[in-house]
């Protein structure tokens, strides 16, 4: 455990310092250790915002491998999925891997729970190791 995290997530902001995660350019997406107020989730599906997915798909000329490259590139550079053209992100579905100490017993979530995020990927620290599938018809990546 890394220690106490900010209630607003500013502890994850790398650039520029002192602002909230959504307008930030770069977030720390190192998930090896989490802060006491965080939940680490193994993401299974990214539901990419429609405007963002359409823009990425057009930039890639519809090529699935290029779509993967663009999405992986955004996340690698920014530590989150915030499309630099549209400014939008999306949401995820996944399984809770670890719950921070400050949340244990206080929030109705435990390791192994399947969850869907209710906040945008444009402010959520995200690390993608691999994109297995692109579902162009429903704006999803797996």
What is each residue range found by the language model?
Residues 1-13:
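A eukaryote-biased signal for short, well-structured alpha-helical docking elements
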Residues 2-5, 18, 33-35, 88:
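A generic structural signal for short, solvent-exposed coil/turn residues
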Residues 10, 14-18, 79, 124-128:
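A conserved mid-domain beta-alpha-beta active-site/ligand-binding segment of alpha/beta enzyme cores
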Residues 17-30:
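Short glycine/threonine/proline-enriched tight-turn/helix- or strand-capping micro-motif at secondary-structure
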Residues 32-47, 58-122:
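Glycine-rich beta-strand-centered segment in the early N-terminal region that forms part
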Residues 52, 121-133:
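Short, Lys/Arg- and Gly-enriched loop/turn segments at beta-strand edges
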Residues 55:
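Short amphipathic alpha-helical segments
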Residues 134-142:
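Short peripheral tails and domain-boundary helices/loops at the edges of structured domains
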């Amino acid at each position: 455990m890394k220690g106490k995290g900010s209630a607003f997530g500013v502890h994850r902001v790398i650039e520029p310092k002192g602002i909230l995660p959504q307008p930030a350019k770069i977030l720390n997406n190192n998930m090896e250790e989490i802060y006491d107020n965080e939940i680490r989730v193994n993401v299974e599906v990214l539901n990419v915002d429609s405007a963002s997915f359409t823009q990425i798909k057009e930039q890639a000329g519809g090529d699935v491998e290029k779509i993967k490259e663009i999405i992986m590139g955004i996340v690698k550079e920014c530590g989150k999925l915030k499309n630099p053209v549209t400014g939008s992100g999306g949401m995820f579905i996944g399984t809770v891997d670890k719950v921070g100490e400050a949340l244990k017993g206080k929030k109705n979530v435990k390791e192994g729970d399947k969850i869907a995020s209710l906040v945008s990927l444009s402010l959520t620290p995200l690390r993608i190791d691999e994109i297995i599938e692109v579902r162009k018809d429903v704006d999803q990546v797996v």
